[in-house]
Amino acid sequence: MARLRRRLWAWLLAGFLTIAALTLYQAERTGRSEPVAGSCPESALECPGEEKPLPLPVPVEPSASPSASASPSPSATPASPSPTPPPGSSAPPPSSAPGPACNATSPGACGFPDSRSTGPRIALKRHDTGNMSIKTDGTVIKGWDIYGSLDVYADNVTIIDSRITSTNWWGVNLRPGFKGLRVLHTTITAVPGKGPDNGGVNYAVSNMGESSVEVGWCDVSVFGNALSMGQGDLHDNYVHDIVAFRNLGGEWQHTDAVISGGGNKGRLTVRHNTLLNSVPIDKGASAALGLFADTGVVSNVIVDNNWLAGGAYALYGGGPGATGILVTDNVFSTQYHPKSGLYGAVAAWNAGGAGNVWRGNRMSDGRPVVPEPSP
């Protein structure tokens, strides 16, 4: 009898322990027995039970490959560039609606290139090259602090993340018959009074040939006709502090931040640059951007989303006979003159030219810019 009682108590105890174990197991699974969690540490990348915040947009710095065969990152462009109307069609009339105003003296604050977004991004090593000729295809110059100039007799030459201080006619020059020159993230300047044109210097980048030259994210100063070419891709550059000089003929040299003389064999694209010409009119200032029919008819040019200031007129638009000229969404700053240029924002605009488009251009205070009728 005693043995039976002991067995009964043993079974009861075993059952009780089994029930308790099952209860604890269930509590562990449901979390009811977990202690209250402490606050998530600030160093944690993500806290349990919290929704991830949406990522903030991060600006991506454009970069270029140091290899001559790789293409550099393209410049930021509008999502839908303006289409070119077919020849003979009527371009839409210029908009008269005001645009947003911006500080006339701060292109960088308004989203345009300045000293902070242009020039080399790496440490430089000094190279006293003098006036050096490049004759090897695919040459890459990177991280050089050059005292001299570069005369290019080769294809697919890349100059990137460098600085050029010239006392020659140019900083970089592409000779006829060669192609593929790219000048990126480079400061190009000169020593005033030390150039060959009676102390003056003329071209930061010159294209003597018929192929396109790319100049992007460059900080350019001093040169009288800073970026000079018939065809090319000029984007995200900061051209400023042009220095006036009397040339070998004894006359004040005409100055322009960008100049093209017409007769071009390919497209010239001038997009998202800051182009400043602070030279006084009586000392030679022509334009911030001059499209002149000096050597032939001006055609096939895109002028889009630039900041322009200075000159007699800030923009010369190609003159009679100019065709395929798209001038869109540019800001004409009053930094030097109330009208952007001394006499106005634009001259020599051929409104009736086939494929010519004028749209979305405004003063820095938001007023629309409408060209004067052609004479």
What are the functions of these language-model segments?
Residues S90, D294-V297:
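Short, electropositive alpha-helical surface patch
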